[in-house]
């Protein structure tokens, strides 16, 4: 599985071949420079110091200085280009993950935690960057150094090199033993970190509720519990890594000590020169540190590999493909029809939300919808938007089955305004044009005037170009709703869905805005879910939704006479 993951990573890296060639040349230059220093040391001792040959000493020192300069320049290019490749590659990975994630079905987002998504697109991606740098830079460099060092050790002394080689299989034992534990702990650590991100996101999205209920202490305790769980996984993983590293270093340096001991004996016997043993020890140290570096990287690789796997699952998820048979010109008179529609949420399989619902809505109609909470009012709109797909029955627009069309084509006809206005960080204007970036200034100015935005925007320093903070934190609830409605109207939809979209406005402001909306939407369809009966009294007809079906329909006056459910809703509001 790890090999497959690395192969997927390499597929991203192949786009940066020129940079990688520079990295490889730099790596080889660094390795060659370090290895050549060993032979210079041998020459320095055997031909310079041992024979008191000052010219040979000077030449050796000059060569070492030259090699250090080459080493420094090559290290600069290696570091710059490998990190450059890593940044470009992870940005592409992040883009691919984000681009695929944003095409998920709405139901799939309900199974994901926002914090987990954020963690994957930030922390996990950073781990992949570390993997690229470590694998392509340090792992390959250490491998070249290890192979070069061992080869030159054999060139200096076959006997001593054989002693060093024996230590490599010994090092593999703890690597294999600890590797499985580290891999499992790495996955748990990432999952635990995602829970922390989710908790942070949830906390600061609901900070007012936490303050209002004086719940700061409980939230701190809850966060600390999650933090301790994450810390436990990290500490255990770090202990295993540290233990492995300590064992590796002990084995490597015991081998080097043994080499020095045997080498010193060979010098005394005249089998080796002092220069040979010094260069051998130099190569042994290089090989030892390189092998130690490799084993440490291998012990660390499980965390970034787990992160890569979590990202690849997002990238590899195949989005649902949709046919696009439905063709509807905006000039056609719009109509909507539900025929015996049933629907149940996957998260609540035992609760039928829409139950054999049938209704028809023609163009140039303002339709009000009322009903008790959980009756299926909002679900009706979300089915029309293709956020979900009905279990049975048919939903038609202009007598065309919407399931035969790409949801994006359906949504071009519709503008949707939920009760909780979706406001993005930026300006008032950027939020208004979110649904129609090609809108003219005249259209924008007309809409902000109609929706009453002009009045409060004029009091701001930069008008509609004023920054409104994250999620519109600097705006009131009513101002947010006006912006959301303006965004919907600027889209020039055939169908306008209002889900308690003016609940934050007072009754007079709501009626004034509603009249403006009806004027703009002449010849089209307005469907408005209302909590206040006064919001829909002027509707052409009202649908009373109860237990997932249409319990009654008609004008306000008709329903007041003929529908017990509607009368009860009106009576409850009057009582309140």
UniProtKB/Swiss-Prot annotation:
- Subcellular localization: Cell inner membrane
Its EC top class is translocase
Q: Where are the transmembrane segments?
A: 21-41, 61-81, 135-155, 158-178, 242-262, 277-297
Q: What is its EC number?
A: 7.-.-.-
For the ABC transporter domain, which residue ranges apply? 336-572
Q: How does it assemble?
A: Homodimer.
Chain ranges of the ABC transmembrane type-1 domain? 20-303
Q: Name one GO cellular component term.
A: plasma membrane
Family listed: Belongs to the ABC transporter superfamily.
* Bilayer topology: Multi-pass membrane protein
**What is the name of the protein in this document?**
Putative export ATP-binding/permease protein RF_0214
Tell me the domain comment.
The ATP-binding domain (NBD) and the transmembrane domain (TMD) are fused.
Molecular function terms in GO for this entry? ABC-type oligopeptide transporter activity; ATP binding; ATP hydrolysis activity
Function description: Part of an ABC transporter complex. Transmembrane domains (TMD) form a pore in the inner membrane and the ATP-binding domain (NBD) is responsible for energy generation.
Q: Which domain of life is it from?
A: Bacteria
- Pfam families named in the record: ABC_membrane, ABC_tran
Assigned keywords, A-Z: ATP-binding, Cell inner membrane, Cell membrane, Membrane, Nucleotide-binding, Translocase, Transmembrane, Transmembrane helix, Transport
Where do the annotations place ATP binding? 371-378
